[in-house]
């Protein structure tokens, strides 16, 4: 948890460095303060994660999930899991995960990455009422109650990772998701898009929005 007047900073060797945080508390994580990193940050809590109205997140990349990631997948790379016949999900639910576990971004919360970064959210229920911004990168909100699959695209015209879920959940966007010259992907059994999901296009780079 990060209180309203508190801050947490990860000082990492470079932008490719990754901090994996497995949160074992019996309740959702609550982030109301500032979270900063010059690299990648993973927040894993099977009970849910809340970004409150005063939350400000600035990282190179951010992954937030109620589904677990195994040590082998984390070490080998999330896009390599699909090539493994016995464990081909990048993220998978543990038996004790709350089937209604939620990732919520409240109105007023701001989540940003550096140029070319990525913000990914995986949970049975995902609700965004805040601002998510990843210039030249990718924003993925994929709702699933069991497994998420990620793969690199062979098509150079497609921006970002390809995403599939086994059993889809509910995604709601009432806020702003902006990926200038990048990609926005909203995926689930029910996708409620009543906010802004925008990916701009430049002369050399095509933006895209996938629902």
What are these regions (language model features)?
Residues 1-211:
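Extracellular and secretory-pathway beta-repeat/beta-biased strand scaffolds
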């Amino acid at each position: 948890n990060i209180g309203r007047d508190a801050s947490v900073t990860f000082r990492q060797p470079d932008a490719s460095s990754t901090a994996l945080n497995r949160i074992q508390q019996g309740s959702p994580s609550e982030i109301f303060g500032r979270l900063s990193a010059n690299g990648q940050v993973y927040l894993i809590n099977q009970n849910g994660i809340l970004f409150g109205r005063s939350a400000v997140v600035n990282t190179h990349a951010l992954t937030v999930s109620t589904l677990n990631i195994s040590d082998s997948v984390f070490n080998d790379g999330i896009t390599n899991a699909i090539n493994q016949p016995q464990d081909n999900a990048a993220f998978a639910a543990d038996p004790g995960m709350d089937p209604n576990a939620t990732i919520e971004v409240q109105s007023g919360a701001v989540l940003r990455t550096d140029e070319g970064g990525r913000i990914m959210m995986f949970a049975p229920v995902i609700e965004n009422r805040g601002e998510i911004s990843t210039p030249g990168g990718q924003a993925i909100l994929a709702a699933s109650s069991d497994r998420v699959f990620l793969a690199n695209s062979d098509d150079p015209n497609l921006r970002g990772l390809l995403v599939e879920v086994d059993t889809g959940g509910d995604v709601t966007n009432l806020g702003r998701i902006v990926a200038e010259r990048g990609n926005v992907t909203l995926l689930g059994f029910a996708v409620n898009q009543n906010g802004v999901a925008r990916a701009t296009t430049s002369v050399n780079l095509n933006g895209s929005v996938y629902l």
